[in-house]
């Protein structure tokens, strides 16, 4: 069960795709989803999630400023669950991932977000959605230590 927001001209195609995928979402599930929306539970839940993710985003931003070496830069997203960070010194984040994993931290190298993998060699996507704030701080600290070591700082 889900919803989509799209131009009206595309809606028929999406309905057909949904019908082709599973024929019909169960009626009971539809009634429950409708009740959740009508009573405001979904709106309340989304509001709570926004607060949680904002705290985690802000925690990551603060930790980056505290623990990462000079020359690194990152986005300050207004939405989503990820930060985009760039590192200096010719570090290829595909290769650096091995050092990060040794420090028990993972990220997605930036190159994987380029269609021909022809860019983003110095970039990484960092996820703040899953971990609690204290884990985010520790992970960013560990990455900072590894980056400083890789840069000889």
Residue ranges, per PLM feature:
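PLP-dependent class I/II
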Residues: 1-153
């Amino acid at each position: 069960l889900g919803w989509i927001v799209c131009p009206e001209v595309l809606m028929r195609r999406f309905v057909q795709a949904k019908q082709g995928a599973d024929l019909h979402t169960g009626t009971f599930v539809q009634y429950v989803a409708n009740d959740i929306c009508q009573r405001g539970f979904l709106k309340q839940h989304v509001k709570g999630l926004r607060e949680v993710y904002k705290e985690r985003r802000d925690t990551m931003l603060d930790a980056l400023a505290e623990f990462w070496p000079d020359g690194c830069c990152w986005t300050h997203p207004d939405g989503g669950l990820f930060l985009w960070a760039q590192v200096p010194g010719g570090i290829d984040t595909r290769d650096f991932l091995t050092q990060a994993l040794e420090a028990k931290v993972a990220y997605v190298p930036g190159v994987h977000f380029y269609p021909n993998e022809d860019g983003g060699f110095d970039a990484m996507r960092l996820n703040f959605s899953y971990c609690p704030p204290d884990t985010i701080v520790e992970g960013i600290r560990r990455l900072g230590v590894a980056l400083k070591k890789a840069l000889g700082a």
